Amino acid sequence: MGSHPIEATNWSFECVNGTDCGSNGLWITTTSQPGTMRLWDSGTSWAILNNAAGTYSWTNLDISLDLIAEHQPRAVIYTFGHGPCWLASTACSGSGSASSGKYWSPSPPTDLTTTGSPSFNAFVTALVQHCSPAGHCVKDYIKYWEMWNEPNLTHYWNGSIAQLYNMFKPAIPIIRNHVTGAKISTPPVSGGDTAWIASWMALENANGRLSDYYGFHVYLWNYAPETRINMIGHMVTAKNTNGWTTTPWMNTETNFSVDTNLCSTQYTKADCEGQIVRWHVLQFAYQGGAGGAFHVGWYNWPSISSGGYDTYYYTMMQWLTGATFTASCTSSGTVWTCPLTEASGKTALIVWNAAGDSDYTPATEYLDYKKFNGTYGGATETISAGKVTAIGVSPIMFETAK
C-alpha cells in the first residue's frame, strides 16, 4: 500500500461484524480481491478485545489473523476506536439502541493524563504482541494503524483533540517498537472536517509528528463523484496548508451513503455502476500534494456483491493496477478525461460523460479502447485514428500502441 504506481493494496475492503465475511470465519467471495483488509467494525475494537482491566478476548482478532495468513499477499489496517465501558470517564448506560454509550464509550479513559493512558498503553502492548493459537502474529500481518475512527464525531470521541493526542503520543512508539515497518495514519475524520484535522496537525507540528499518512473518510452521500471530489480537494488543501504537502493521503472508508451503503435511486443502474469507477479514478488521479490517493477503502464489502458491482470493481482493478496517473482529471462541460500510463507502458486516457451518452473524438495516437460490459475484465475495441467514439456514464479507457 502507499505507492505510485498503484498496487492491489491501494484498495481495501471492510467486513462488518456479522456479515458474510470476517469474524464468521469466511473470506470474501467476490472475484475482485482488494489487496488490503481494514479491520474497523469487524469485531476487533478496543472495547471488544479488552473487556475488563487486564482481561483480553482475542477470538475475533484470531479469526481475522488466520484468514489473512491464508490469503497472502495482503496488507491490513487496524483502526483504534470504541473505548471500553469499564474505563470510561462517562459511564455507559448499558441500555438503549445506540451502541455508543451502550457497548462502548466515546469518552476519554479515566486514567488519561497529559502523559498518556496506562490502560491504553497496556492494550496497545498486548495487541502488538498478540499471536493467534495458529501462530499468526499481529506484528507480522498488521502494518498500518489509524489513530481513532472519526474522532470529530462526538459519538466516537467526546474528549478534546489535545486529549486524543496525549493518549496516542506514548502509544505510537509501542507500535513502532514491536511492528517492523509500521505506518501510522492521522485520526481519519469524516465529512470533510478541515477545522478538526487542522487542529490535529498543529498539535503534531508543535509537539512531535506521529503520522506517516494523512487519512479521512469521504462518502459519496448521494452526490455524483464529480461533485464530491471537491470535498477531497478541501481535505488535501488543508493537509498542504499545514506544511504536510509531501505526506501521502488516504480515503480509507467510503461507499455511496453512510446509512444504507446503497446508490441513490435518483441515479440509473448504469450510472451507479459507473460511479464506482469514476469515484476511484478521480481520487487516484487527484494531484494535490504527494500525488493522488495512496489508498481508497470500500466500507461494508458485501454491498459490492449485492449491488451487482463486482465485475466493475474487478475490471477497474485490472485497468489501474500498475498504472500511474500523470495529471488530475479535468472536465470540459460534463465530459471528464484522466491521463495515465498503464503498467505495460502504454499511454492511456480514461473518459466519460457524467451527464449521459455523447460522442467523443480521441487524439489520433489512440488505437483502441477498453470498456465495461458486465463481464470480468470487460472488452477491448479497436478503432481507427481519430474515430468518433460513443461515451457515457461508464468510463472507457483509450490506449496507444505503446
What is each model feature region?
Residues 364-378:
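Solvent-exposed beta-hairpin/edge-strand motifs
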Residues 19-25, 54-63, 120-122, 164-170, ...:
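Well-ordered, non-membrane alpha-helical segments in soluble/globular domains
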Residues 211, 218-249, 257-273, 278-279:
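Substrate-binding surface in catalytic domains of secreted glycosidases
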Residues 1-42:
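Boundary/entry segment of secreted carbohydrate-active catalytic domains
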Residues 251-335:
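Aromatic/acidic polysaccharide-binding cleft in carbohydrate-active enzymes
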Residues 379-402:
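C-terminal beta-strand-rich structural cap/linker in extracellular carbohydrate-active enzymes
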Residues 331-367:
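Carbohydrate-binding surface patches
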Residues 32-211, 215-221:
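Substrate-binding cleft and catalytic face of glycoside hydrolase catalytic domains
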